[in-house]
Amino acid sequence: VLKVSPQALPYQEVVKKTKEHIYQGDIIQAVISQPFVYESSPDPWLLYRAQRYINPSPYLYFMKLDDITLVGSSPETMVRLENGIATLRPIAGTRPRGKTEKQDRTLADELLKDEKEKAEHLMLVDLGRNDLGRVAETGTVQVTDLMIIERYSHVMHMVSNICCDLRSDLNAWDLLKATFPAGTLTGAPKVRAMELISRFETEPRGPYGGAVGYISFSGNMDLAITIRTACIEKNCLTVRAGAGIVADSDPDTEYVETINKAMAIQKALELIQQS
């Protein structure tokens, strides 16, 4: 069973401390995560196959590196570049999936009507527009999808799509530099939010909130944000999950959101044990 890491500070207390900085005008939002650990090392390939079955997502990856193995099923694009068109697809706003189709629709409607979630989402859309604006041809930044619902195995998300024409004198590396790390994994303003994250999260994030993908010789790029990702190292599995903290965030609600986001990997682990 995944358990909150004993090294982590109590999540609800960190939410309260983060809100103090918001009230002081220090930040608008910070994405605070916590680590969940599984004191065993499942077969990474079986975990990957279980993830594909339980939580099929736009980005599925199995990466065996020197000391660690990453197994991920990420729903979120970090940044994409295809034939000169740059795209961000921020996710902000989460609800658990309903047990019935009717309950699922009710939860989706509730998410779309939640003023707190909408305000948080629009702020991150603006952050994404600003990031792209630094590398875009003048006047080409546009929001093509705004606050639509995407459903996954255990949660549903509110998602938008932002795109632009990349300036002709720039390339994929310039685009990555302008947009990384994703605002949906840091908060706003980015730098100050990251400073507070470094203070409140007692352990390094590791791969969480980074990016996995490719940059091709043709100049195209497609990177996923490393969320819903298990990191297996030294006979221990770790997965991080976070929530965006704003002025009216409820500490208990945000804590439950992190658990809901970690559930897909928990279910994959259970499937391995049953097989």
Describe the function of each predicted region.
Residues 1-275:
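Extended alpha-helical targeting/anchoring segments
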